Amino acid sequence: MATRMTLEGIYTPLITPFHADGSFDLDSLADLVERLIGAGVHGLISGGSTGENYAETVEERLELARFITERAKGRLPVIVGTGAMRTPDSIALAEGARAMGADAILLGTPPYSVPTEAENAQNALAIDRAASLPIILYNYPARMGVEMGREFLDLVSVSTNVIGIKESSGDINRLHLLTQHYPQIQTSCGMDDQALEFFAWGAQSWICAGSNFLPGEHIALYEACALRGDFTTGRRIMAAMLPLMAVLEQGGKFIQCVKHGVEVTGINAGPMRPPLTGLNADEKAALEAVITTLTAEVAAILAEDSAQGRPAAAARV
C-alpha cells in the first residue's frame, strides 16, 4: 500500500518544449520547472495530454518523467501520467514511475477501446499493482469515450492507493456524486471553467494547464476560495479568467494556446508534434490580448484586497 497523499493546491500538467527538429528541449523544460516552483505551484504532472503524450513513445515519456522528477525532487510532488491505448504501455509507465521515485500516477481510461466499467476497473487495478503508488484517476469521457461511473468507482475503491480523481467531464452532477458519495476519493478540478464550483463543493486542488504560463493567477483563485473561503474575491478572479478559459476550451487549439502562453513568458515551447500545428498570427495576437487583460484585472483585484486589509497572495509569475 502506498503512503496516503493529500491533493492540495495548483498542479501543473507540463507542456513538452521541442526543438525545431522535434527533439526535446530539456533546457527550456528545466526553465519552466524552475519558474513554476518559484511561482508557488504545488505539484507537477508529467506525461499528460498537455505534454503531447499521444505523440511520444513510452521511452520518451519515461525520459521526460525522469528528468522532471530529478529536477523537482524534494521540492514539489511529481505525478506521472500513465494513460495509453495499450495496458502493457500503461504498466511500463507505472513501473517506471515507481522506479524513478515519482510521488503518484495519473490514471485514465484507455482511449478508443471503449471498455465496460468492469473492464476499465480491471485495467486500472492492473496498473495499480504495477505502480504501488498513490493514484489520481482521470475522468475525461469526451476524449476517452467512457465515463468512470459508479460501478467503476466502487470496484477501484477496493484499492487504498486510489486517493483522488481529476474530474474533467464538465458535468456538474459528477461533482455532486463524487463529493457526496465518494468522499474517500479527493476530487480535483479538471474543468477550468468550473473551478469556482469545485472549490465551493470542497475540492482542494485544481489541475490546470493554464498554470504553465499564468501560475500566479491560478494560485490566487485557489487561495481565495480553498484557503480563505472568500468566494466574493473568488468570483471576481474567476470572472477575469473566464475569457482565457473560453479561448482554451472553445477554440479547438488547447495545447497550442498553452504552448504559446509559455512562449509569452519568455520560455521556448517549440513546435507541436504532428498532427497538430501551431497558432497563426491572428490567434497568437488574440491570446496575448486576453492574457494582458486578465493579468491586469487580477492584479487590480489583489491590490484592492490588500488595500482593504484582506489577506491576498500576489499573482506571481
Task: Please provide the spans of the model-predicted regions.
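Catalytic cores of TIM-barrel enzymes
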Residues: 2-6, 177, 262, 317
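Residues at alpha-helix boundaries and short interhelical turns
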Residues: 40, 72, 76, 189, ...
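Gly/Ser/Thr-rich beta-alpha loop segments that engage phosphate groups in nucleotides
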Residues: 11, 50-53, 83-85, 166, ...
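Active-site beta->alpha loop and helix N-cap motifs at the rims of alpha/beta catalytic domains
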Residues: 3-145, 154, 301
